[in-house]
Amino acid sequence: MRRAARASAPGKVIIVGEHFVVRGSLAIVAAIGRRLRVTVRSGGKGIVLESSMLGRHSAPLPGQGAAAKVSPVLEPYIAVLRSLAARGYSVVPHTILVESGIPPRAGLGSSAASMVAYALSYSAMHGDPLSAEDLYSVAMEGEKIAHGKPSGVDVTIAVRGGVLAYRRGENPVDIRPGLTGVTLLVADTGVERRTRDVVEHVLSIADALGEASTYIYRAADLIAREALHAIEKGDAERLGLIMNAAQGLLSSLGASSLEIETLVYRMRSAGALGAKLTGAGWGGCVIGLFKEGEVERGLESVVESSSQAFTASIAEEGARLEEF
């Protein structure tokens, strides 16, 4: 066994399909060029997590010190560790160092990227890096603790990278984007929320609507398929219209907020072809599709209403091992 290993995974934006993907609709998701890195070092006592964003947390190894209270921040990592142990990896004391270029709790997949990078680095430390299929399965155990009923789309894109068409229970399909001359603007509302709370709220509204909600879900699935075709054909104008329609559907099920709508309309007023929330909603981030020559105006438009904003490129590479 090596003394240490390091791995990274990309963040993501959901172009269309968040929430609806939980119940079988299509989602289009893209990895972005911001990554989260995890370094695992053996030694010490128990498990220690060190992160500039999440702080420092420690806990006994699974099966030791069962009476000790474990920080909720560490619980997903422990779930991943248990899954690794079930696959034959030895459980040893170690430190987890997290370095992230992905804002946490912002809908950009930081949690999934962390679970993926941790699972890959821990398995690599043992000299046997997980396959992509096993990496997905192990990381999902952590996401279940973090989010309750994750669709799996965040973990899939963190493992694979690129742009994917994702439907729960089916193999993801790689999309070859034909878009040129456009870029995504990402603006963070600065409002943190628990994904699990928003997912449960949206599902409760859908259930309360009964049969009417089936039409909303059908519409979401249809526009996701239209988005796929627009991306492949390079039809940015149509993709923007689809993003706007997707925002309306998400709002109808209670996923939006005043902070989100403010950023959406500021982007649209600044020339965005389309703008919508990405991720769970209730806060987190908004994405806008801009022509390259107009994105600076978009950035200026959201300065006062966001905690941070940046342009995002598509990351073709998913999870990877890294040298020290």
UniProtKB/Swiss-Prot annotation:
Subcellular location: Cytoplasm
Keyword Kinase: yes
Co-factor requirement: Mg(2+)
GO MF annotations, alphabetized: ATP binding; magnesium ion binding; mevalonate kinase activity
Enzyme class: transferase
SUPFAM superfamilies: GHMP Kinase, C-terminal domain (SSF55060), Ribosomal protein S5 domain 2-like (SSF54211)
Pathway assigned to this chain's UniProt record: Isoprenoid biosynthesis; isopentenyl diphosphate biosynthesis via mevalonate pathway; isopentenyl diphosphate from (R)-mevalonate: step 1/3
One annotated Gene Ontology cellular component of this protein: cytosol
Short name of any one Pfam family annotated for the protein: GHMP_kinases_C
Catalytic activity line of the entry: (R)-mevalonate + ATP = (R)-5-phosphomevalonate + ADP + H(+)
Principal subcellular localization: cytoplasm
EC number(s) given by UniProt: 2.7.1.36
Record note on quaternary structure: Homodimer.
Family statement drawn from the similarity comment of this UniProt entry: Belongs to the GHMP kinase family. Mevalonate kinase subfamily.
Official protein name in the record: Mevalonate kinase
Source organism: Aeropyrum pernix (strain ATCC 700893 / DSM 11879 / JCM 9820 / NBRC 100138 / K1)
